[in-house]
Amino acid sequence: MTVRKLQQRRGWAFSLGVGIIKPLLLATTVHDWRHGERIPATGGCVLAMNHISHLDPLTAAHIVYDHGRLPRYLAKAGLFENALLRRFLTAAGQIPVEREGRGAVAYAAAVEAVRRGECVVVYPEGTITRDPDMWPMTGKSGAARIGLETGAPVLPVGQWGAQQLLPPYSKKPHLIPRKRVTMSVGEPVALDDLRQRELTPEVVKQATDRILAAITAQVEEIRGAQAPAERYDMRVSGDPYKDRKSA
C-alpha cells in the first residue's frame, strides 16, 4: 500500500527492484508499520535502524518506498565485487562501505547524499546483532557523525520479524506461513545541543548513545519487553556467529 506518492525519479535499478522484490515481500510478509509518516516527505534525512536479518534491508526499503522516498544504504563493499550487482547497486544510488581502511570515503559519500536531499539508511550496529535475544547491541558512529555534520534529522527505526523470515546467517528462508514484519519510526533524535559543540569523540559518542537508545526504545515498544540494561558488545563477549559465517 502506497501511503505517500514518490516524488523522485526511480531510474531503471529501482524500477527493476520494486517490480521483483515488492511482490515477493507482499507474498511472504504481513507488514505492520507504525508512524511511517514521520519519515520526511522531502529533504535529507538519516534513518538509523537495528539489524536482525540479511533480509531486513529489503523489508526496510518497503516502508521507506511506500512513504515516498528512495532509500540509499551504506552497503558492504563486498556486494560491489560482482560486476552485475555493482552496476545495479550503483544505479540505485547505494554507497559502498569498506570494512577496513576506507570508511572515510563512504562517510563523505553519505554526507554528500544527505546534503543532496537523499534519505540515507544506516545500521549503527554495523552488522546483524549478536545479542542472544536480538536486542540492539553496541554501535558505530556513522549515523551520529552524519547527523551532526549535516544537521539533518536522524530518525530511529525499530524493526522486528524479518529474522523469522531469514534467521541470522541462515541460508534457508522460512516463507510459509507469511511472517509479520513490524517497523516503528520514532521522532528525530535530539542532537541540536551537540551540534553546537566541537565534533570531538566524546560528542560523537553521546550522539551515538542517544541514537541507539532511541532505536532500542522503538524495539521495546514493538516487542512489549524491556531490553537488557547493558548492551551486547562483541569486543567483550565475542562473536557467536563466527563459525556459522565461515561454514
Predicted regions and their residues:
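A transmembrane-helix-recognition feature enriched in membrane-embedded lipid enzymes
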Residues: 2-41, 59, 83-92
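Catalytic core of membrane glycerolipid acyltransferases/transacylases, capturing the structured
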Residues: 40-101
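Hydrophobic/aromatic ligand-binding patch that stacks against planar heteroaromatic rings
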Residues: 88, 112, 145-149
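A charged, well-structured terminal subsegment
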Residues: 108-113, 181-217, 221
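Catalytic-site beta-strand/loop segments enriched in glycine and acidic/polar residues
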Residues: 113-143
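A cross-family acyltransferase "interaction/gating" segment
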Residues: 133-202, 232-238, 242-246
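Short, flexible loop/turn segments with low-complexity composition
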Residues: 221-236
